[in-house]
Amino acid sequence: MKQYDIAAYVWPAYTGKEDRTRIFWPEGIGEWQTVKNIADILPCKPSGYSWDRKPLWGYVDEADPYVMEMEIEAALDHGVNVFIYDWYWYDNRPFLENCLNDGFLKAKHRDKMKFYLMWANHDARTLWDRRTSHQPTTIWEGKVNFAQFQTIGRRWLTQYFGLPCYYKIDGKPVVSIYDVANFINGMGSVEEARRALCWLQEEAVKAGLPGVHIQMVKWGENMLNLSGVDGSSMQLSQLEALEQLPFDSCTHYQYVHFTDVNRDYEEILPDVIAEWQKLKTGTEKTYFPHVSVGWDNNPRFFGFMDAVTRNNGPKVFEKALWAAKTYADENNQIPLITINSWNEWTETSYLDPDTVYGYGYMEAIKRVFL
C-alpha cells in the first residue's frame, strides 16, 4: 500500500517550562490556561455561542517525553507520521523550543516518526494573552536581518537537520517559512532575502547534506488578518515571491489565510480545492495540498470574533482528506499532505481527542490513508 506523509502542525505552547511563556500564561501551564479557563469568557459571547470541549488526554505537558511517547504512538496508529513544529525566534533567542527539545526529541519512540520546522516568523503580539488580546501590541518582532538569520540557520543545521528523524525530501531537510513578507522585510529586499536562502543552501552542503528543501507557506493576496498575527505586507504578490525566491515548494498553514472561513465546512471545501488547482497551474513549484480542521479563535478573546467555521465534524473533514489524497496521487511524486493541526486548541483546529468527537478526526485520517 502506498505510504503517505501526513504532516500535522504542532503549536508548542502547552508547557510552562520556559520562563517567557509566563508573560502570556502566568499560571505556568502554557496556553492550556486559556483552554482550561474557557468559562471565564463565555458570558461575554453572543447568545447561542458555545465552546464546550475538553482534552481527553487532560492538560498534559507536551515538553514531557513520556507524554510525547503517548502522542507519537497515537499519531502513528492513525496515520499521522510527521509533526511540523512551529519554531520561533524572538529577541535574539529561540522561543517555545521546549516541547520539541525536551518532549518529542527525548521520547523513546521519536525515530518512528519524522518532524520538520516551520519558522513562525510573525510578530509576537498580545493576542496570546486573553487579558490583553483586545489591545493588539507587538511584544517581539519576528523579522530578522541577514546576520541574525545566519545565527538561526546555524542552529537549525547543528541541532536539527542532521537528525535521523528529521523529515527530508531527496535527502534534503525540509524547512518552511511562515511569513515570507516579514522575511523579505527583515532582509531589506528580495535580493537580500534570496542571498540569505542561498547562504542556507551553501551551509547545508558544507555540513554534508545535499542541500535544504525550502518551503513557503502560501497566503492569499488580499488576506484579512483574522489570526491576529498575519499583518505583514510586501510589494510582491505571493506568487511572485514564490517564483523569485529559491523556494522548492509551497503549502498552506490554514484555510483562514486564503478563503472566507465564516461558513459551513461544506461551502469552504470547493474553494479550497480551487486554490489547490490555481497553484497547480500558477507555478512550477510543487504545491503540497493542505487540509484544515476548522477555525474559531474565540477562546483567545473576551469579545466575539465572528469568523467561525461551522459544521466541521470528522465526516466532512474526511471529504477534504479524500480530495487531498486524490490531488497528491495525481500531481506529486512526494505524497506529502499538511494538516492544521495537531493541537491548535485555541483556534479550534486540532486532531487531539476531545470530549466532543473523541478520536474522530484521527480516525478519519486512518480511514483515508491506512
PLM segments and residue spans:
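Glycan-processing catalytic domains of CAZymes
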Residues: 1-370
